[in-house]
């Protein structure tokens, strides 16, 4: 199963486990809430998917790698206490609360979320002294004498034995108490995630051409050679920072993330080509509608790999524009909500004597506290977090401008803030207009170069895969996207019908 399907299975499990009956009791009792066990190769996104599931379900997440724990930290430290049995006092051994269970309660207190996921990574790599405690944890949902709180799903992840010499295989008794999900690497699924995370365009273009380099694990006389999804994502992050700082990116840097010499060298060579294509084809000029006939002819005559790379450059730049428009929309929507709330406070009969600055400051502090709480709970994805930070920054600016302008009355202050908000709304409209123009220009360039050929099919398919382009087009429209997408769907449907007819003919020939 790919990681996207595994994510859906985990979400469904959470929804089912947290469902309650008319008496407020969990419909599935804790003893029947099987832990979810993800088994798969290292670096394919098992930990990242838990963060996404927790965020999308609005629950807390406590994550631990069991290889960092000893028996004492997992089940608690022993201490001596006195107890009376049958009228006689005895000295007995008890245990402090497990560090892991204590972290669950700390998270509940910090975030206010009473339900969540307790995720234990590398669970089948626990030390020999800790292995019995792990089996007890999976079977009984306890660490030592302390149970995992109700409303918390237990999830764990491990690697198959071929990837880790420290692996201890679970017995049938343990496996019969978990929901085991085997996860396989899948580039097409990871690509959807990559677009949303803003993975470097060169990586996406390269992997589109070299899909077999997305994940590699080889054993040689010199040791392991490997490339993982985690490695590509971390490489993307460092590439962007290096480019922003104008630092050289060499093969040695790439090999630090892609620990497979042949693939690292191949990508380093491709990265040089990718940058050359960006300069040769003047991608920004294309998206501004300033492309030349020579650029069109050059692309028409180019090898297929080069065509894919240029389309990757266009898609990467478009994705940045769509992402910027999405973030601007989130920011303005948040500001609009804040202004409505501010207006209500200004007009409230209970706040007539309160200076406008105090009301504004109180609102700002409340929104900052709410943001800090959501951020602490991990409920915000990166773009939403940036939008919230921008919203708070603009609210601080609005307050400072009101004070600087010497506003005394609430009406005067609100009029000034409303005018400042209008400029932010105009900025959002400009971002949307710019992104729409870039999309139209990209279509115009590709139409002139390839018409409705396979390159256009690939372009439409990639737009449909990208979270930000789908969001942008669904809200702002694109005539050419709708037209080509409809033609593509029609062609696919027609192809399926023809295949079904041929299949039916074959079956009839076999019968007669």
Question: Can you say where each PLM-predicted feature lies in the sequence?
Answer:
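Alpha-helix initiation/capping motif
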Residues: 98, 149, 171, 200, ...
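Context-gated lysine
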Residues: 4-7, 11, 20, 46, ...
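Alpha-helical lid/collar subdomain of P-loop NTPases
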Residues: 196-357, 361
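Conformational switch/transducer regions in large eukaryotic molecular machines and scaffolds
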Residues: 35-37, 57-67, 80, 89-119, ...
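Terminal-proximal interaction/regulatory segments of ATP-powered molecular machines
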Residues: 300-512
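Histidine (H) residue identity feature
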Residues: 68-69, 146, 200, 213, ...
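Charged/polar, solvent-exposed surface patches and flexible loops
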Residues: 8, 12, 16, 55, ...
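AAA+ P-loop NTPase catalytic core and its hallmark functional loops
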Residues: 1-212
């Amino acid at each position: 199963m790919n990681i996207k399907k595994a994510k859906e299975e985990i979400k469904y499990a959470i929804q089912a486990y947290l469902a309650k009956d008319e008496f407020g009791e969990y419909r599935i009792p804790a003893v029947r809430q099987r832990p979810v066990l993800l088994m798969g190769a290292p670096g394919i996104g098992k930990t990242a998917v838990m963060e996404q599931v927790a965020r999308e379900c609005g629950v807390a997440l406590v994550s631990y790698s069991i290889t960092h724990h000893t028996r004492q930290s997992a089940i608690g430290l022993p201490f001596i206490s006195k107890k009376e049995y049958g009228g006689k006092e005895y000295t007995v051994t008890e245990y402090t609360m497990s560090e892991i269970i204590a972290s669950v309660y700390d998270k509940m207190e910090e975030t206010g979320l009473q339900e969540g996921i307790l995720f234990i990574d590398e669970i089948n790599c626990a030390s020999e002294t800790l292995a019995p405690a792990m089996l007890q944890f999976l079977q009984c949902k306890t660490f030592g004498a302390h149970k995992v709180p109700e409303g918390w799903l237990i999830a764990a992840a491990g690697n198959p034995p071929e990837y880790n010499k420290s692996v201890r295989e679970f017995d049938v008794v343990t496996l019969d108490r978990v929901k085991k999900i085997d996860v396989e690497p899948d580039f097409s699924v990871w690509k959807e995630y990559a677009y949303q995370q803003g993975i470097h365009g060169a990586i996406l273009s390269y992997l589109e051409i070299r899909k077999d380099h997305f994940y590699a694990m080889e054993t040689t006389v010199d040791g392991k050679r490997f490339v993982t999804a985690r490695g590509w994502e971390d490489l993307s992050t460092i590439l962007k920072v290096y480019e922003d700082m104008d630092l050289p990116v060499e093969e040695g840097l790439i090999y630090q993330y892609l620990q497979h010499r042949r693939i690292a060298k191949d990508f380093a060579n491709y990265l040089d080509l990718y940058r050359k294509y960006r300069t040769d084809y003047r991608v920004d000029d294309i998206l501004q509608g300033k492309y030349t006939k020579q650029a069109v002819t050059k692309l028409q005559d180019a090898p297929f790999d080069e065509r894919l790379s240029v389309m990757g450059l266009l898609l990467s730049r478009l994705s940045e524009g769509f992402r910027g428009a999405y973030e601007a929309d989130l920011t303005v929507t948040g500001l609009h909500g804040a202004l409505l709330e501010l207006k209500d406070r200004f007009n409230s009969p209970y706040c007539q004597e309160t200076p406008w600055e105090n009301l504004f400051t109180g609102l700002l502090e409340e929104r900052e506290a709410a943001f800090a709480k959501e951020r602490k709970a991990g409920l915000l994805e990166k773009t939403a977090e940036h939008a919230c930070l921008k919203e708070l920054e603009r609210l601080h600016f609005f307050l400072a401008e009101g004070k600087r302008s010497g506003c005394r009355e609430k009406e005067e202050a609100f009029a000034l803030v409303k005018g400042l908000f209008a400029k932010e709304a105009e900025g959002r409209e400009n971002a949307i207009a710019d992104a729409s123009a870039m999309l139209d220009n990209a279509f115009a360039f590709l139409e002139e170069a390839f018409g409705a050929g396979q390159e256009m099919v690939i372009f439409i398919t990639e737009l449909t895969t990208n979270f930000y382009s789908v969001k942008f087009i669904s809200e702002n429209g694109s005539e050419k996207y709708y037209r080509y997408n409809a033609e593509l769907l029609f062609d696919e449907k027609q192809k399926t019908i023809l295949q079904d007819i041929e299949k039916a003919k074959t079956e009839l020939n076999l019968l007669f």
